[in-house]
Amino acid sequence: MINENIFRAYDIRGKADEDLNDDIIRKIGIVLSEKILKTGQNKVYLGTDCRLSANRIKKSLISGLCSNDLEVLDLGMVPTPIVYFATKIGKTNCGIMITGSHNPKEDNGLKMVINDGAVSGFEIKNDVINLK
């Protein structure tokens, strides 16, 4: 069951091991890959912060993103502005940052940019919930 409260105005946030489990993150990756591909892009930058859950989330997210043959350009562990900067000067204007930001260490989340615009968690909520 998906906690619908993880989908927020400017991002996705929740308890890393409960709300952002592997299945949910993979579904988010699939939905984001579909949105990105609809814009004519076929690549996405991906960065992580230093939270302990970041690598697990990254692995599941990449699985979902690559299910539609999207190329993931892994920036590794970087500050969030590096992902935004890469989308301005790099090979694509799409990026995802896995970050818990200022939230407690048990939390994590995703900040997403497609075609230079922030993606609201609300925008993809129904698609993620309805994905089988």
Regions found by a protein language model. Give the residues of each.
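Gly/Ser-rich phosphate-binding catalytic loop and adjacent alpha/beta segment
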Residues: I2, A9, R13-K132
